[in-house]
Amino acid sequence: LSPHELFNVAEDVRYLAPEQLSGFEDAFKSWQDAARSNKSVLARQRLHLIFQLLRHTGARLGEILSLDDRTAFDRDRSMVRIKGRNAVREVPIPEEFCEAATNVLDSPMGCGLRGEFFKVDPGYLRRTCYERGRECGLPKELANPRVLRNTRAVEMLRNGVPLAVVKEVLGQSSLDLAAGFQQFTSQD
């Protein structure tokens, strides 16, 4: 047996189960698709894209909101460059998401915000997360950027990604923080 098959997440770590994450993603997508005016379409596209970046990268909210959309994405390698506290790290993202994100950024609506696309009020993004979470039955404490970060970490660990790689992807300076996600029982 591999360690990733045995570990349990510490009780104090809030994260989403796969079906909760799927519901959260669906709620954001439905909300985006329900936009009618050009202004609303753009606002919702921006917030949905930020949500997806949080979901797929495990980055901190501040890291995503400070991205320079002109240089952050590497379409050829399906990567996003995230400036962390001490360095820039390259985080892989799903190819189809990278393509969709760069298409939005290159669209007429996205071009008008070049260099500023991700600069939104963090409180507004959090409130939008709470609202989408409520729509899919998530309690407020599970519908936020921190929980998306934790969820991504748990997802990677459960898929057998080594702890050191998870630490690097999340931009953690020590293994202690990421190690808190893994707990093994004495029988393990």
Predicted segments, located by residue:
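Short, basic (Lys/Arg/His-rich) helix/loop patches that form interaction surfaces
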Residues: 33-40, 130-168
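A short, glycine-centered helix-capping/turn motif at helix boundaries
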Residues: 53-63, 159-161, 172
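Catalytic-site neighborhood detector that most strongly recognizes the C-terminal catalytic loop/helix
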Residues: 84-85, 170-188
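Short, leucine-enriched amphipathic alpha-helices that occur as contiguous helical runs
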Residues: 21, 43-48, 122, 126, ...
